[in-house]
Amino acid sequence: MAKKRHILCPFCFNGFNNSEVEYQCENMERDSNGEYRCERDIDYNFNTHWKVEGTQVRHIFTPKKGFFSSFTGPSLEQEKSDRCGYPSRRFGCPHCHNWVPSNMIEEGSEIISVVGGPASGKTNYIVALMHQLRKYGHKLRLQVTPQQVYRDNHPEESTQNLFKNKDNQLFKDYQVLNKTAVEDTTQRIPWIFQLKHLDTKKTIYLVFYDTAGENFNDESSVSNNVKYLQYSEGVIVVLDTLSLNKIQEIIKSKGLSDLSDISTPIEDTGTTLNNFISNKAKELHKKPFAFVFSKFDTVLNNARDMGFSTDAFFDGSSFADSSYINSGKFDVQKIDEISDTIKGALCEYWNDGNEADFVSGAEANWGDNHKFFGVSSFGCMPSDAGELEEVKPYRVMDPLVWILYKLGGFDIQTINEPKKK
């Protein structure tokens, strides 16, 4: 008998109890004419979700429920299809009828979401983050698993396959990942990674959409594009360092980079995000928010020109990467120091009238439940052709590890405090 849990569908983001889960028939046998022995259905719920017509999918059926299941939890055992009698244990969302992985149904589906405006570097960041987490996660006893979530008959859309392709492009071919076209309005599959602590068994899911980014100039667009945001236990907001006016001025004066693809200004992000949360998801003010400035190597390598103190980032004569990569322990004081340094720059030298307001708004809305981070997905600036001499991600895991530390249950051991369970 499984524990009764509330589930959030990774496709439509409607909630349901796992006792309400539907089953999809797993019978793949065909008759002499090549037809499935368990006839496929043109499913209204599935087709409505994907905005298509006539797509045939596996037969979905409601399992038999015992009288006490509503009190004790669902069995989640194999059930025989009501059409062909084939034993199945493949679960489907009762709302959109998409396949939901069994571990989500059994263990729950708490999520951390990653959002960011167009050209913020969100896709490059998530690939670098997952690459580093798979490489160093064992130091924190964390296991990361890309999920096999995809539309029926489209396994190429799974997180595992999509991530592998982009990981190879970035870390083997040394090529910046292609930008997603802003006009691409395709209903996309979310990237979903399961994060699990090997000792406490605490599980959470990192959810990310490989789209052109949320339009933070428009609250209705945020509401439509990031419906999952309001159900998140924590949020990583990717901000483009190059979108800051003062940074743009300095970069242009040095001729360092083409700024034609800068992201949404942070003041627009702050205003729209705050309005969305205040109107539709007030509980998010109680959840940890990591404001992550991407492409931060631009600042660190030109700190003197940008009026930025690098003391919080240096260890002797070189930039210090995250402490847990070597020690397995999280340096809370270092995270505080970095956050305070970035906030100080936003309020002073980088302030162009709006940056300080963004900081004060974050402090008013989230208090101790927010931090600022500076990360680099590449560790260097790419060429105009998008080529990289090497790829050495810098501090990309910090925002996620900090959120896990704040949430508790992941046994994140620290240098400065007693370990927090």
Write out the residue ranges for each language-model feature.
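Long, basic/Gly/Ser/Thr-rich N-terminal segments
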Residues: M1-I105
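Conserved nucleotide-binding/hydrolysis micro-motifs of P-loop NTPases
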Residues: F13-F16, A212-E214, T241-N245, F296-V299, ...
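Switch II of P-loop NTPase G domains
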Residues: F67-P74, E183-H197, K201-V235, L242-I250, ...
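Flexible phosphate/Mg2+-sensing switch loops adjacent to catalytic phosphate-binding sites
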Residues: M104-I105, R134-N178, N416-E417
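Glycine-rich phosphate-binding P-loop
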Residues: E110-Y136
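Conserved GTPase G-domain signal focused on the G5
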Residues: G121-K122, K334-Y349, G379-P418
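Conserved C-terminal guanine-recognition region of P-loop GTPase G domains, centered on the G4
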Residues: H197-T200, S223-N365
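Beta-strand-loop-alpha "switch" segments that mediate conformational coupling across diverse proteins
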Residues: E355-P382
